[in-house]
Regions:
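Compositionally biased low-complexity segments at domain edges in trafficked proteins
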Residues: 147-163
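Proline/serine/threonine-rich low-complexity linkers at boundaries of modular beta-sandwich domains
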Residues: 8-20
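Intrinsically disordered, low-complexity Pro/Gly/Ser/Thr-rich segments with frequent PxxP/GP/PP motifs
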Residues: 66-110
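Buried hydrophobic-core signal for structured, non-transmembrane domains
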Residues: 41-44, 119
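Short acidic/proline- and small/hydrophobic-mixed sequence motifs that coincide with surface turns
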Residues: 51-54, 67
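Asparagine-centered strand-capping/turn motif at beta-strand->loop junctions
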Residues: 44-51, 61
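Terminal connector regions
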Residues: 104-150
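Short, solvent-exposed loop/turn segments enriched in Ser/Thr/Gly
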Residues: 23-24, 34-41
Length: 163
């Protein structure tokens, strides 16, 4: 007897050696630089037997880019492999990492309701020696929180505060 599912086919789905997931919805925060920021993490898990490099991440909202693209040293500096090492955006077979994003945009722009990401990855072609497979896709989306960011301001009330 065939099974049934309520899930519908996703015509935009991409098969990637790395699974990406946003753990918590980002909350818009007005920062000291006068810009709005979305600070959040993307978990990356290499579910393949290949060594895969994350080359570039660009946040997108309402079908356009938002914030600066992360690539090269900027991306490497915001990547922490889950074995505690830093200095690489390359994941070996079965490895995982956290990518720390800080997407900033003008206060004049409306806060996005959702964000997605254009992600470029690459890996050695297992069929053609010396060749590299490069893949770019748009996905890894999440809703943006509507909650107001927590504000810490004077005067602070309560016990055990040190000033």
């Amino acid at each position: 007897m065939p099974g049934t599912s309520s899930a519908r086919p996703d015509s935009k789905a991409v098969i990637s050696p790395i699974a990406f997931d946003i753990i918590n919805r980002p909350t818009p925060v007005e920062a000291a630089d006068g810009r709005m920021h979305l600070a959040y993490e993307i978990q990356a898990v290499n579910q393949s037997t290949l060594t895969v490099t994350v080359n570039r991440i660009q946040a997108r909202a309402q079908k356009s880019t938002i914030g600066k693209s992360l690539a090269g040293e900027d991306l490497i500096n915001r990547t922490r492999l889950n074995d505690g090492t830093t200095g690489s955006a390359t994941l070996g077979a079965g490895e995982s990492a956290m990518l720390f994003l800080d997407v900033s945009y003008s206060k004049k722009r409306r806060n996005p309701k959702t964000i997605a990401h254009a992600i470029t990855t690459s890996w050695p072609d297992p069929v053609t020696i010396g060749e590299t497979v490069k893949q770019t896709f748009v996905g890894v989306g999440t809703k943006v929180s509507k909650r107001k960011a927590i504000e810490v301001a004077a005067p602070l009330r309560g016990n055990n505060w040190v000033a």
